[in-house]
């Protein structure tokens, strides 16, 4: 499923980053499942959304939901990532801040334990 998405990513730098991101998430959080919804790979816990990804021409968008974006706004800024209320972007010339990425996933998993809806 993830490979089908990756095969559509035309930018080889972004494709490599996404492959590494997906592999790290699967290693660190093996209980998460993956689904493709709205043409975006998403990591799901017990039927609830944890984080989603998309690839543009020159950046990766990572969407962890608004609550998480607000909670980590300062961290995204310090990492040099462009952010909106719903997502942050990793440009092709930026490194993945692994600590931050894994922290937001762990945060969402903890915050959404027992949550019964897909979105917050």
Language-model features: locations:
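Charge-dense, helix-prone N-terminal extensions
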Residues: 1-120
